[in-house]
Amino acid sequence: NGLCCSQYGFCGTTSQYCSRANGCQSN
């Protein structure tokens, strides 16, 4: 479904969730 989850466990579809520069990983 395109959701990305941040290192803090919050999920969304915008770059703030999906950006690897923010330590996030796509599922």
From Swiss-Prot:
Practical applications according to UniProt: Has potential use as a flocculating agent in water treatment processes.
UniProt xrefs under SUPFAM superfamilies: Plant lectins/antimicrobial peptides
Short name of any one Pfam family annotated for the protein: Chitin_bind_1
Domain spans labelled Chitin-binding type-1: 1-27
Domain of life where this protein originates: Eukaryota
The entry's keywords: Antimicrobial, Chitin-binding, Disulfide bond, Fungicide
Disulfide bridge partners, by residue number: C4-C18
Entry annotated with the keyword Disulfide bond: yes
Function as written in the Swiss-Prot or TrEMBL entry: Chitin-binding protein which functions in defense against chitin-containing fungal pathogens.
Name the record gives this protein: Morintide mO5
Provenance organism: Moringa oleifera (Horseradish tree)
